[in-house]
Every structure is written in structure tokens, then in C-alpha cells.
Amino acid sequence: MNDKKIDINVYSENFPNSEKVYVEGSKPNIRVPSRMIKQTATKLNDTIQENEPIYVYDTTGPYTDPKYDIDVTLGLKKTREEWIKDRADTEESKRSYLDTLKPNFDNAQYGISSRSRKAKSNKNVTQMHYAKQGIITSEMEYAAIRENIFHNRADHDNKITPEFVRDEIASGRAIIPSNINHPEIEPMIIGKNFLTNRTPSTAIFLISSL
């Protein structure tokens, strides 16, 4: 591939009558995507009634954001990178995940790092550990905002709070798959009290990612 840039509009055309929008959290680097779907007006008894747009869970990633500048050499946007570093409980490993795949890979050529991260000595970096310590992480806040996407009207009392998410994780009733070496992940929560209550790969996440 000679051209490293991708025309974002090609992807956006797959979602007519809709727009990718964001809900900002308590910090500027917490921006949760959702898709606003426009509804046509309803004709009833010779009157036209406008219908409010519908907001749905959006998991399509940055490639459906018309404002996102895609460069395939840089990979996906690292949504969680700042959150992970701000917690100051991980460090860069000497091991690179590209050492065996591409021994001669030149990181500097692309301005990226292929070094893995690991927990610092005597540190636990799982979302369950944070939850049990009473810590509400950015991932938990992000997941809570996502859960309320369907209820974003001003007259609706949001029932899913970051604290509720934390408590569900601490109790073992829910998980947020969030490996520290996948900062590109847009956090979602899986549990019986949430929009996604089961997934075939949950067992794999529990074993290899948490």
C-alpha cells in the first residue's frame, strides 16, 4: 500500500441518516462515542409530527468519525494511553511484541513504540483490583456513560453511575476487558445488569486480559 491515508468518507457513507457524536466525561480525554440516528417525521391526521433522533451504542471505532485523520502506519487511536500512564502503576517492558514477529522492525521510522507495558513491582493493574480499592477509573466512567446512551434525554434520570459500575465489578458481577497493552480499547462493561450481559469470549478475557 503506497497511500497510507484513507478517505474517512468512504466509511461514513455506510451509515446514512446518522451522525457519530460524543459525550464528554469528567475529563477532556474521556469522550464516549454514540450514533445519533435521524428519524423521518410522522404524518398523522394531516399533521406532521417531528420525531426525536435515536441514540445507539457505537462500537465502530474512529474510522467512522469524519473528523478523524486516518494513517494506517500509526494504528488505532490509543483511547486509554493517558489513563494508564496517569495511574503511574505500570512501566515499559524491555520486551517488544514485535521482536519475534518482525525482528528488523524500525520503530523510529513510524514514530511508534512496540514496547509492552507491565505492572510495577507489587502493583495490581486490573479493573477488579481498582474497584475493590474503591477507585473509580476512567474506564469505569467511560462504561457508565456508554450504558446511558439510550437514556440521554434531559427528562430521563440516568441510573447507571460510575459508582454502580465500580460496585458491580468489585462484587464480581461484571467485568471491563481492558488489557494494559491494548490502549486502543473503547471500554465496555459486561454483566447481567448491563446492555451486554454475556459474550462467548468472556472466559478468554478473564484468563488472559484481566
Region roles according to the model:
Residues 208-210:
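Short, acidic/polar
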Residues 1-196, 205-206:
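Non-catalytic terminal accessory/regulatory regions of metabolic enzymes
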Residues 199-201:
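A cross-family glycoside hydrolase active-site/sugar-binding cleft signature
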